[in-house]
Amino acid sequence: MKKKTGGMRIFKVFGLFLFSLIFFGLLSLATFPKFLLFDRLLIQNKIFLIAQKVKENSMSIELFKGKVYFQNREALEFDYTKLSLGFLSVNGKILCRGKISEISYSFLGSIETKFRDFSCTPFVKKVNGRIELSDGIYGRVKLEGFKTELALLDEINLNFKGQTFTGSVKYLGMELKGQGRITLNRKNFLMSKVDGEFKGNGVRIKVQGTLNNLRVYMK
């Protein structure tokens, strides 16, 4: 009987310790300047965020009227963004021109994005689709009015299948079809390598480089 009482006492002490650990962990997270940590993570990847107003809540950050710059160029703008801490994840919602897009980052190692008429980047007129990044890239995405240094591509449809992708490109009334490979860099997603080609009607478009430095060749 004494052994049982001792075991219960140890269990209660362990439970109290675990509860205290979780409580003080959440408390420190709630009081920590989360935007500074978030901003530091962006700067490490040469991404700079400017917002007119920042509001920090206990488990979330709200950003109002901001822009994101990458490699000294404007990458996107937004009217409102909210980043919330979930169970083993960080969830984000981006509001721009009345449309909401979502992104979810899991601490288990995956990222999921959902775009709904996203039109807040100078490089693309509109983006729709869903993409999941885990051991590879999965999902579909449609880009309308994609601007390159060489030409304006009317529409791009891509289907990601892990380490490969297939799709089509509409350009000057022509439809080019092709495929390619993605060599994923888990430590730095923007350094993942891309090698793809689209052909049709005697025209060939070659895409090579990394996600942060894509080069488009037309022949």
Swiss-Prot record:
InterPro entries xref list: DNA_ligase_ATP-dep_CS
This protein's record includes keyword Transmembrane: yes
Topology of this chain in the membrane: Single-pass membrane protein
MF terms (GO), sorted A to Z: DNA ligase activity
Segments crossing the lipid bilayer: 13-32
Name of this chain's protein: Uncharacterized protein aq_1287
Compartments (UniProt record): Membrane
Chief place of localization: membrane
Gene Ontology CC entries for this record: membrane
Keywords: Membrane, Transmembrane, Transmembrane helix
Upper classification of the organism: Bacteria, Pseudomonadati, Aquificota, Aquificia, Aquificales
Taxonomic superkingdom: Bacteria
